[in-house]
């Protein structure tokens, strides 16, 4: 059975707390797993969440600050220790190549798994598969940072009443889907476009064009909200977003489910992030992330 969900492994920002691990997010997309921003302690969080190294197919790093990348060393070594039977692909800013190599080879271990490095150097597609296209967009942060967007190809939804009106039943339904027409009836006449699902991952950044482009029409948006609104100046100075800013991005982009995360340790009440997001006018589904939370990708409309 296909599963599309986000598994939150960690939600802290610069430093972990007693209740929050450094960043880490696994997107399950049918039979594939994409690990985003594995911070320190991600390998242990994977164990707690029931995520195996075998579940991973891609690793996407937004930038090389420690809370988004220090877990790479342990995760990569675990992939090799467990002899994952498939290739792993890693995406990260090309400008951080030296950091990736230091983390990949932080200590001695036996390499048993092919890990393909596909660094990001500009906006655009990184991978095109039958299941999705993975794109990157530049963000605005003191070090080079990219956000990621996964887009499923549009499909077709067959309309039973139109099929019946044209007398198309049984195996003929498959034939018209495959061939595009049947007996003078075009596929467009008996079906409609089923928009593919869209997922966006936006970490450390100020407001910028890339944030809006990544979020546009997303079914599920995972976005940093390091600061509360009263600290907006501090957020901008350090290259981050507030809860209200993140919520307005989601509101204006038509996001269906907003996940706020990457919280500063200075705040004791995480629910205030949710209250400020609602006050900013976001009316869709909202999750203030906690470690080990699972968030399903919203069902297709």
UniProtKB/Swiss-Prot annotation:
Key word DNA-binding present: no
Q: EC annotation?
A: 3.1.26.11
Please provide the record's keywords in A-Z order. Endonuclease, Hydrolase, Metal-binding, Nuclease, tRNA processing, Zinc
- Which residues bind Zn(2+) 2 per the record? 67-68, 204, 262
Cofactor binding summary note: Binds 2 Zn(2+) ions.
SUPFAM superfamilies referenced in this protein's UniProt entry, alphabetically? Metallo-hydrolase/oxidoreductase
Active site residues of this protein: 67
Where does the secretion signal sit in this chain? Answer: none
Catalytically driven reaction(s): Endonucleolytic cleavage of RNA, removing extra 3' nucleotides from tRNA precursor, generating 3' termini of tRNAs. A 3'-hydroxy group is left at the tRNA terminus and a 5'-phosphoryl group is left at the trailer molecule
Under the subunit heading, UniProt states: Homodimer.
Q: What does this protein do?
A: Zinc phosphodiesterase, which displays some tRNA 3'-processing endonuclease activity. Probably involved in tRNA maturation, by removing a 3'-trailer from precursor tRNA.
State the family it belongs to: Belongs to the RNase Z family.
Q: Which NCBIfam families match?
A: PRK00055.2-3
Q: Quote the protein name from its UniProt record.
A: Ribonuclease Z
């Amino acid at each position: 059975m296909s599963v599309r969900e986000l598994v939150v492994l960690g939600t802290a920002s610069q430093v972990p707390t007693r209740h929050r691990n450094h960043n880490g997010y696994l997107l399950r997309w049918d039979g594939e797993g994409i690990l985003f921003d594995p911070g320190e302690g991600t390998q242990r969080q994977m164990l707690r969440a029931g995520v195996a190294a075998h579940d991973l197919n891609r690793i996407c790093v937004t930038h090389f600050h420690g809370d988004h990348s220090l877990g790479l060393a342990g995760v990569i070594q675990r992939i090799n220790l467990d002899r994952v039977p498939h290739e792993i692909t890693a995406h990260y800013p090309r400008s951080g190549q030296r950091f990736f190599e230091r983390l990949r080879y932080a200590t001695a271990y036996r390499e048993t798994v092919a890990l393909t490095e596909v660094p990001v150097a500009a906006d655009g597609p990184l991978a095109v598969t039958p299941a999705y296209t993975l794109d990157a967009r530049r963000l605005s942060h003191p070090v080079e940072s990219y956000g990621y967007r996964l887009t499923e190809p549009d499909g077709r939804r067959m309309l039973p009443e139109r099929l019946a009106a044209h007398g198309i039943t049984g195996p003929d339904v498959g034939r018209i889907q495959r061939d595009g027409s049947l007996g003078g009836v075009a596929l467009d006449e008996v079906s409609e476009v089923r928009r593919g699902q869209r997922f966006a991952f936006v970490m450390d950044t100020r407001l910028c064009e890339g944030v809006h482009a990544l979020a546009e029409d997303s079914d599920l948006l995972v976005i940093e909200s390091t600061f509360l609104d009263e600290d907006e100046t501090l957020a901008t100075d350090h290259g981050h977003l507030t809860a209200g800013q993140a919520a307005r991005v989601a509101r204006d982009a038509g996001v269906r489910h907003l996940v706020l995360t990457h919280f500063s340790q200075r705040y004791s009440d995480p629910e205030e992030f949710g209250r400020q997001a609602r006050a900013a006018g976001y009316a869709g589904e909202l999750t203030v992330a906690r470690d080990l939370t699972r968030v399903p990708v919203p069902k297709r409309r």
